[in-house]
Amino acid sequence: MVMSEFVYLYRGEAPSALSPMESQQHMQKWMTWLKQLGEQGHLKDVGQPLERTGKLVKGKQKTVTDGPYAETKDVVGGYSLIEAKDLDEAVKFSLGCPIFEISGGIVEVRPVMKMNM
């Protein structure tokens, strides 16, 4: 079966309301979920969490500003690369993500376009 690649973009607010113990328990849920995806042969790259700071470069003038802003509710907090037979299957796999348990979390599921270089 030919598999396609998809990116999971994890979006949401920082889970600042969690105690250190709750944060550790939540991280363990992430590790368990990602391990299951890997054991099923669907996790191509675990990815990494992203810092909540950075710069934005915008437009023809290449204007540089601070951002994204941590105060923004819809910040990309990390990513993973998975393989699935189609978009529906990729969405199905995302349903077990622990991000849904806190902070109004979102998993954006995007197909990766193949480019011949």
Language-model-derived ranges and their functions:
Residues 2-117:
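Conserved, structured core segments of small domains
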